[in-house]
Amino acid sequence: AKVKNARSKDLADIFNNTASSKMSLDDILEFSYEIAIGNEKISLEEFNKLVEGSNGLIKYKNKYVLIDKEESKKIFEQIAKANFKSLSRMELIHASMSGQLDQYDFDYDAAFAKIIQDFTKPVDVNPPETLKGELRPYQMTGLKWLWTNVSKGFGACMADDMGLGKTIQVISLILKMKEEGLLTKPVLVICPTTLMGNWMKELQMFAPSVDAVIYHGTERKLDVKHDVILTTYAIMRIDVEELKKQTWGMIIVDEAQNIKNPDTAQTLAIKMLKSDIKIAMTGTPVENRLTELWSIFDFINQGYLGSLREFQKSYAIPIERFKENSRAAKLKMSISPFVLRRLKTDKHVISDLPEKMVLNEYCYLSKSQAVLYEKTLNEMMDKISGFTGINRRGNIFKLITALKQICNHPYQFLKS
């Protein structure tokens, strides 16, 4: 069966400029199925009659054609069920990148071809003039990768190894978009509380021209008249009703493994926020299950990997349960344009990084701690020796906890 594109709506200007590409990712592309034997197109009815009246060998216009009857029935049922189909541009790109279209003789028209061609074409960009610092070559590559995705209306997952400078690459993107006049609304950065100070420090160091504020604390008040607003996951979850009223110029989620569970209140809240551009930063896009990857993609490029149920059926179950390498390869291929993962141990990425130095620093117990530690250990070991089974295991765990508390501070164990 030959699948030919019949028509597409208003595709001539796809990706011609940043604004139109951002607004067009969910536009609908339309196509229809057609059947051909050789180069001769035939109707559905004629095809069905030929298949029904054959035992695998059919005669068509003085030619004999060998055909798989069962496969032909499947083709007929598929076409009869949905002779006219539609895809969003996001779905078309996923189908193309994952190889789903390879099973068909898919006849693209010029507009369809342009979508795929422009999508795979990198966009060059110069470093921002207002950046106070110099990007390493691999960081410049990261900026170009971010710029390519953002300029075509896609989100991205920056998954570089810790220490390669994910933050400065994303800050460079903010500066470049600001210089190009593409940021007319504030950028919202959501990160763990422990990283908020580091974000502010790096913004002040590398991007002093950016007006950044912290939205945190009991006296917080949302003021969107700033370039960048920094907040935490906890505050975002508490104030989601306020934050979702805004349409943000860009939303950046640092330590994105915090949204790996698709059903948690935190993840659901963050996906309520509105922005055309969403960036996830994480050194561990997948920690335990593939659905964690789906959850991050549902944030950066909603719909690209289908619904959660579709993803589980197409990828998670075949890969995790049945170890299907072909599915894993398809998934890797389909997500590769949107995930940048580089390791600092890779000399092709960075060759002048010194070897990791491990320095052991020992913290010694005070005299009172040492006495209490030994006394507690001896007393509880004598007690444990008289126990068996679950009682013994429970008391061993209790001893470990007690010794940890003493090492931290005797007060934590003594409670006085």
Segments (PLM) and residue ranges:
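Accessory nucleic-acid engagement/destabilization modules that flank
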Residues: 1-114
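Long, charge-dense, solvent-exposed interaction surfaces that engage phosphate-rich ligands
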Residues: 328
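ASCE P-loop NTPase motor core, strongest for the SF2 helicase catalytic module
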Residues: 105-323, 332-353, 357-416
